[in-house]
Amino acid sequence: MASSASDGTHERSAFRLSPPVLSGAMGPFMHTGLYVAQSWRDYLGQQPDKLPIARPTIALAAQAFRDEIVLLGLKARRPVSNHRVFERISQEVAAGLEFYGNRRWLEKPSGFFAQPPPLTEVAVRKVKDRRRSFYRIFFDSGFTPHPGEPGSQRWLSYTANNREYALLLRHPEPRPWLVCVHGTEMGRAPLDLAVFRAWKLHDELGLNIVMPVLPMHGPRGQGLPKGAVFPGEDVLDDVHGTAQAVWDIRRLLSWIRSQEEESLIGLNGLSLGGYIASLVASLEEGLACAILGVPVADLIELLGRHCGLRHKDPRRHTVKMAEPIGRMISPLSLTPLVPMPGRFIYAGIADRLVHPREQVTRLWEHWGKPEIVWYPGGHTGFFQSRPVRRFVQAALEQSGLLDAPRTQRDRSA
């Protein structure tokens, strides 16, 4: 978090209140041990109506440990700033509460998300890989925060966000479309193509695939001030990042519809992307499905959980104060518009990043308890999970995005 209500420049202190090196290195081991101990207590005392709990095993502990390593890396990119910086953050959060409260957006969050204009001008460039070809598409985002919104000038100074980028795998004939929304620290072509198994979705299942890059990720993360990340401790940056991500994807949907008016469109999001996809699915009508993988339900609450601040740390007050803003940009405050048969969620029972009960279960309940798969793994374990792969394909079939088995596999032209 990095600006006062007056929107000063991004200012960071060299002093970090990070844990000592030794305790930081031992953290994943200690946290995994605590997780295993708690898992045994939950497993032995679980009730039928509670969150599914698997018998603790070495494999499950390994998944939890891997998550703890990932979490350690994410925290290294997001060190907690000192009290002086948090004082400025508190001022901006207070200004945000007043700004959003005066417009009643804290009570009616749908008004916060502005309706973007249709997307008409898109640049398309063909890219040839070793064996395949695909497209990169570019367009001007056109997003700006609301006039007078706290943090807006700082956000607009992140000029790399002004242009949206996306990967496109497209068939020559009309086909259903799947918009795949990546997670934190992604937004790079090789990684996104692999994690989403995009070529299988395109070549074998016959889908057109679009993979937009979220704000402050990939090419949109160039030239940022040190410490500027999305999501991160800067609450108003998180608000603007969420709003722009939703805006950009809604514009992209308008372009897809202008290309193939009759084709079905679905959303497929991972982690942070599942959070963004759930918001889009609560604002945009006409979507065939929304598949939410290990989704975040309340971004500000999640960041507060992982901030590492002690209970009596005065900076905790800022985190607590920001909770109404977190609820404003949460899908838990909106009504999903995707039909019930098109809602799907999958999550890991050993997830150490996105807490299954605090995040996923609440979103699942809010969405009317749609089809859900709990795989025995951590946050990153979905990639190796066969139940998840089968679930995603079944979701696409149930939503009508997949037709009869294809006799000819089209490759992008």
UniProtKB/Swiss-Prot annotation:
| Name the record gives this protein | Uncharacterized protein Rv2627c
Fetch the InterPro entries from UniProt: AB_hydrolase_fold (IPR029058)
Cellular compartments per GO CC: plasma membrane
Q: What is this protein's expression induced by?
A: A member of the dormancy regulon. Induced in response to reduced oxygen tension (hypoxia), low levels of nitric oxide (NO) and carbon monoxide (CO). It is hoped that this regulon will give insight into the latent, or dormant phase of infection.
UniProt cross-references to PANTHER family, sorted A to Z: PROTEIN ABHD18 (PTHR13617:SF14)
> What practical use does it have?
Has strong T-cell and IFN-gamma inducing capacity in human tuberculin skin test positive patients, indicating this might be a good vaccine candidate.
